[in-house]
Amino acid sequence: KYSFYHNEGIFWMQITKENLTIIIVTIKSQNVIDNCLTSIDPEIKKIIIENSSDEEFVKSLKEKYQNIKCYLTGKNLGMGSGNNFGIEKSSTRYVMILNPDTILKPDTLNRIFEKSKNLEFAILSPLSDDKNYPNYKTKKGTQIENNDLFEVDQVDGYAMILDKEKFNNNFFDEEIFMYL
């Protein structure tokens, strides 16, 4: 079920539903996570890291959604440690780090799957259409608004796909608590 592409003696693997796991780190996000989860194709694996000991929250997610694994941490690990925990639990080559208040458009992942053909990358990140969160700018300061691939110096953490093979198990710095 994996798609491989050959170009100049190099093979690249395309992201697919089968080789992607979406990781969502949350702390008592019942009020927003349903919108996020319903925006994700039910066939895609999902790992929820709940930074509390709220067993009812986890139970309700498991009852409502398929292809979901939930882990209670018992305490607030923060984003870095929580994402590392989720990545460690994933069995796929690619992981998407997604904030619980992010809603994917219906075609977002299919467009990313298509763009990943013939592409060697470490991180892919979609553009946001939320006016409160402006998109990337080029080094010249020009706002990016199109659908083409482009390189950036940094990505926003609300939604990003990582190729685990490019990171040698060095994902997020756990000394940086980030926010939660």
Model-derived regions: residue spans:
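Glycine-rich, basic loop-to-helix element that forms the pyrophosphate-binding segment
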Residues: 73-90
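Donor nucleotide-sugar recognition loop
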Residues: 169-180
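A recurrent flexible, glycine/aromatic-enriched loop bordering the glycosyltransferase active site
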Residues: 144-162, 177-179
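Short, well-formed alpha-helical segments that are part of the catalytic scaffolds
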Residues: 24-42
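A conserved acidic beta->alpha catalytic loop
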Residues: 39, 48-58
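Conserved donor NDP-sugar-binding/catalytic core segment of glycosyltransferases
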Residues: 102, 106-137
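Acidic helix N-cap motif at the loop->helix transition within catalytic regions
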Residues: 34, 54-63
